[in-house]
Swiss-Prot record:
UniProtKB keywords: Behavior, Disulfide bond, Pheromone response, Pheromone-binding, Secreted, Signal, Transport
InterPro entries: PBP/GOBP (IPR006170), PBP_GOBP_sf (IPR036728), Pheromone-bd_protein_Gp-9 (IPR022354)
Name of this protein: Pheromone-binding protein Gp-9
CDD domains, A to Z: PBP_GOBP (cd23992)
């Protein structure tokens, strides 16, 4: 059974990190619960931001707040269906485990540090949808930066 390690994406999450290489793909589109969560929120794939747009931060300037919120609700739905969130609360340990499993990251890996920093940055946010999108965006941005720095090395 395929685990939705969006887990980042972190983030959501988790799998989003490896998906960040394909910037034209929609965030979360490669996971089992994507279509279900779209349907539950009355959205289509066209309503969902691309990985490239989110990892670069363009989603914040190119879209209305309602679009941001709706995308976040789809992310939260997928995270919750995969047991990584309950409401607005993360299961941080499960998120780390799934992220490590998805990415192959080892202890001390900067990707794990980035995931931890993103969870810390968003942990006090109360709106579950906004929190989920900010988390996913944080992880994708960190993945993009780390990928760029390793390519430059």
């Amino acid at each position: 059974m395929k685990t939705f390690v969006l887990h980042i994406f972190i983030f959501a999450l988790v799998a989003f990190a490896s998906a960040s290489r394909d910037s034209a793909k929609k965030i979360g589109s490669q996971y089992d619960n994507f279509e279900t969560c779209l349907t539950e929120h009355g959205l289509t794939e066209d309503d969902i931001f691309s990985i490239g747009e989110v990892s670069s931060g363009q989603h914040k300037t190119n879209h209305e707040d309602t679009e941001l919120h709706k995308n976040g609700c789809v992310m939260q739905c997928m995270l919750e269906k995969d047991g990584l969130m309950s409401g607005a609360d993360y299961d941080e340990e499960k998120m780390r485990e799934d992220y490590i499993k998805e990415t192959g990251a080892q202890p001390g890996d900067q990707r794990i540090e980035a995931l931890n920093a993103c969870m810390q940055e968003t942990k006090d946010m109360e709106d579950k949808c906004d929190k989920s999108l900010v988390l996913v965006a944080c992880v994708l941005a960190a993945e993009a930066i780390l990928a760029d720095s390793s390519e430059a090395a």
